[in-house]
A protein has these predicted regions:
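Structural motif
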Residues: 1, 29, 283, 351-353
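A phosphate-binding catalytic loop at a beta-strand-loop-alpha-helix junction
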Residues: 354-368
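PRPP-dependent phosphoribosyltransferase catalytic core
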Residues: 191-192, 366-393
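Residue-level signal for inorganic ion chemistry
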Residues: 282-285, 380
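C-terminal helicase lobe
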Residues: 1-196
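Cofactor-binding loop segments of dinucleotide-utilizing enzymes, especially the Rossmann-like FAD-
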Residues: 33-36, 357, 385-387
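Residues at the starts of beta-strands that form the adenosine-phosphate
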Residues: 29, 310-311, 351, 378-381
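Active-site-facing substrate-recognition patch
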Residues: 189-283, 293, 297, 301, ...
Length: 393
């Protein structure tokens, strides 16, 4: 049996995979799963296949303004562009002949052709259109009620010898696989979805050493001092994923007023008891927000009550900052939060559970934990309802 958890990118790819799956056996099932998210995934990869013209222009302008050239970390400190996107843009322009940029050791240096370089828009658009057409044909295959093998053959300009294959689910609907399942297995699957917690590992290094050193009054060294490091934490779920992950956006964006359900409190208590059976948490606080000032504190207070711990609001947001999800690389993510929090009141000693709704880059937890540790907390354990990370920095 061969199973595709999502649609292949094209009919040709799918046909080749079907051929490999059935090779050397007399009989095999091929099951293609599809859902609404398939088009979203395909669209994401199509859109991210080439660098954005805006990013390329900004990168080349920065390199052109530097006689000695710039390294990737230096580029990251100058522009709000993800490291992976900077690397993608540089790889793309350096593949051009002639190239507007060359690499000299760790730095990227402009060539005399830099001022004349233009992104090949027509070629990029042509390839993008081809990929959209491939995606549309794959969608049509999934929706088709005709013989599926004949559909594939027509797409490959190789008409089938017989009008019907007499094997696919459209030709033989009575031979389709059963849709009923063992209730015990369904229950186990539901339990698995509700136990999709992920570790929150502490960041060990600053992204912008000079800015962090000035803010915390410490030596300008790359490594974050041990006394300012948060402990390892946990994210309860994967944002938007089945089970608990869907309850987080429901509570934050669709509930009126925004409110996280008691089911999330129950699951958090269960996770903390399972993950930290021997570690004693001594108090609870949360990351403050000026956009939704009561959402996370309300949840953290209910969680603290269930854990029989005091809830102490000791962090205050001092200014409005752009959402962290708009910060594309580590330097901008770190510096967006420098000076954004302050301590109000007295910070209890002992191990603190620091609660937030979502975690992505981990810089919010990193900066807030450093502030709490410097103010007297003995340890800070971060806890988020969902991991919303999409990768990158």
């Amino acid at each position: 049996m061969q199973t595709w958890p999502q649609e292949p990118k094209s009919v040709v790819d799918y046909y080749q995979q079907v051929g490999r799956a059935g090779r050397g056996v007399d009989f095999a099932y091929g099951i293609l799963l599809n859902g609404d998210e398939d088009d979203e995934i395909a669209e994401y990869f199509i859109k991210s296949a080439f660098p954005k013209e805006r990013d390329v222009s900004e990168i080349l302008a920065a390199i052109g303004a530097s006689d000695a050239g710039l390294s990737i970390p230096e580029l990251m400190s100058r522009m709000n562009v993800r490291r992976g996107k900077i690397e993608q843009a540089l790889k793309f322009v350096m593949s051009e002949v002639p190239s507007p940029v060359v690499k000299v050791k760790s730095k990227f240096v402009a060539t005399p052709l830099l001022s004349q370089y233009r992104l090949p828009r027509e070629n990029i658009q042509r390839l993008t259109d081809i990929r959209h057409e491939e995606m549309a044909r794959m969608d049509e295959y999934v929706r088709s009620r005709d013989c599926l093998m004949n559909f594939l053959c027509r797409e490959l300009d190789s008409p089938a010898e017989e009008p019907l294959c007499k094997r696919c689910c459209n030709c033989c609907p009575d031979g389709a696989l059963p849709t009923a399942c063992d209730p015990d297995l369904a229950q186990k699957a539901a339990e698995f979805l509700n136990k999709s917690d992920l570790p929150i590992t502490p960041k060990k290094q600053w992204a912008d050493v000079a800015t962090a050193a000035a803010a915390f009054g410490i030596e300008p060294k790359k490594n974050i001092p041990t006394e300012l490091l948060m402990s390892e934490g946990r994210a309860l779920s994967v944002y938007g994923a089945g089970g608990l992950g869907r309850l987080v956006p429901e509570g934050k964006y669709r509930a009126s007023p925004p409110h996280f359900s008691e089911q999330l409190v129950d699951a958090s208590v269960e996770l903390l008891g399972r993950w930290l059976p021997d570690q004693r948490l001594e108090w609870v606080t949360c990351i403050p927000s000026r956009r939704t000032p009561t959402l996370v504190p309300d949840f953290a207070r209910r969680l603290a009550d269930r854990l029989s711990l005091p809830f102490v609001e000791v962090l205050r947001k001092t200014k409005d900052t752009p959402p962290q999800k708009e910060m594309e690389n580590s330097a901008f993510q770190q510096n967006n939060l420098i000076g954004a929090f302050e301590i109000v009141g007295e910070v209890p000693s002992g191990t603190c559970l620091l609660v937030d709704d979502m975690v992505d880059s981990k810089w919010t937890f990193t900066i807030a934990a450093a502030i709490l540790l410097r103010a007297g907390a003995s340890a800070v354990v971060p806890f988020a309802l969902a991991n919303s990370s999409g990768g990158g920095d």
